[in-house]
Amino acid sequence: MTRHARNCTAGAVYTYNEKKRDAAESGYGTNAQRLGKDSVKSFDCCSLTLQPCRRPVITKDGYLFDKEAILQYIVTKKNEYSRRLKEYERLRRAEEDKLSQEANSKQQARMERFVNAEKPAMTPAHSSAAASEKPSTSSAAAAASSESSSASSISNMTNGHEKKLPSFWLPSECPNAGLAKAQKPDATIYCPVSQKPLRVKDLIDVKFTLLKDGDTKRSLIAKEARYMCPITHDVLSNAVPCAVLRPTGDVVTMECVERLIRKDMIHPLTDRKLKEKDIIPLQRGGTGYATTNDHLQAKEKRPMLQA
């Protein structure tokens, strides 16, 4: 009986299983993982802190945040923009100084070439007389210049070369290494979830209606069913699609929106006229089903191995 199971490593095809195993062990390539129910926040939790919101606010795209957390995020992004703007100004000034120095050096070189071209040429008789007057000096100078040129061509510690590193493999010593190109930073603050422009005045206060269950012993966070629809009194959960009414911030179920509100487009609590943009669907929490949430795959970018 041959040992086929022991000789299964000599295949001519690089299988999918081998690729996945090698990618996991080598540390290269992008890692992807399917998110389960425990990895997705609840519908009433902040998208930044992943904790139940104390002062909930919602964006126009339906992402819920704690007001303190999202304001702190906006302040941090503004401070980061100020820091990047200062760095941009510094790089721009350095680039302007470099360009002015190059222009000055080119102008100086042109002036020197012009002056040298305008100098009168020496006659042959004058040049021979000058050479006959000091033959020893010219020969000594020629010998000294030849020695200095030979020394400079051999040694790397003369004529200022001792300050230059011979480490050609360093990024700063590469031929194309230089000052970073100045790029003006973007002043727009983007939503940390949807990556769309975010402004403080676009945040809408959300008002959850507490569920009247009569249980006063447990805290609100310890309860699984915490809120209800103020119109139908249905319990709100991750499996129940909800929407926020912009004028008052009340959270109602989508079933209530479709059956009661969309008929007349009137707010059932205040009798105010509603528009389509006043109904903001709330992003749902994790239920464990693939059709509930849009983004259920987490990716970790790692270095790519190129052959």
UniProtKB/Swiss-Prot annotation:
Residues 120-159 are annotated as: Disordered. One of its GO terms (cellular component) is cytoplasm. It is found in: Cytoplasm; Nucleus. The keyword Protein transport does not apply. GO terms for molecular function: RNA binding; ubiquitin protein ligase activity. The keyword Cytoplasm applies. Belongs to the NOSIP family. Negatively regulates nitric oxide production by inducing nitric oxide synthase translocation to actin cytoskeleton and inhibiting its enzymatic activity. This is Nitric oxide synthase-interacting protein homolog. It comes from Drosophila melanogaster.
